[in-house]
Regions:
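Low-complexity, glycine/proline-biased repetitive segments and flexible coils/loops
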Residues: 1-175
């Protein structure tokens, strides 16, 4: 599984590095888009950045499985929402090995795939969550979850709080 991209507050995430074992190479994950930018393509795609200011719009998640190989390397990142100014602006979740970003809800990273290499019930290569924090309900102010399989949680709103790193040795993407 290729590595996830590094994140920095307020900037576009870097795409991850390729991972090679013998003759098998897995493409690194695409970096997530920052505010008003699309996510990058990669083994698993990065999520689309949220919009801000007076420029509403939807920004695309990066394509997964890039370059296209068999078996599939990962899924696409989710798109950001296009809410008008003053309402919640949410970035897209990163793609995971098993499902695309946003499959389980806006900002949510896609789930990774189960594998029995280290025993049953082990999941790898979850996508990182999109930036922002929950604004309503009992979890108001809490970060969004990364996908099952080590995906990192989101940072806070406003672009000033970095997301969480993916879990070590799982191939999970950072939030």
């Amino acid at each position: 599984v290729g590595g996830g991209g590094a994140a920095a507050p307020g900037s576009v995430g870097a795409s991850g590095n390729d991972s090679t074992f013998s003759t098998i190479t897995s493409a690194g994950g695409g970096g997530g888009g920052s505010e008003q930018n699309n996510g990058a393509s990669g083994g698993s795609g990065g999520g689309g950045g949220g919009h801000g200011g007076s420029t509403p719009g939807i920004f695309s998640g990066g394509s997964g499985d890039t370059p296209d190989v068999d078996p599939n390397q990962g899924n696409s990142g989710g798109n950001s929402t296009g809410k008008p100014p003053g309402e919640t602006r949410r970035a897209g979740g990163g793609g995971g090995a098993l499902e695309a970003g946003n499959t389980d809800g806006q900002n949510q990273g896609g789930d990774g795939a189960p594998n029995t290499i280290l025993g049953p019930d082990t999941t790898y290569a979850g996508g990182g969550a999109g930036g922002g924090e929950q604004t309503d309900g009992p979890l108001s102010g809490a970060p969004f979850a990364g996908g099952a399989g080590g995906g990192g949680a989101s940072g806070g709103s406003g672009g000033n709080d970095p997301g969480a790193a993916g879990t070590a040795n799982t191939g999970g993407g950072g939030g």
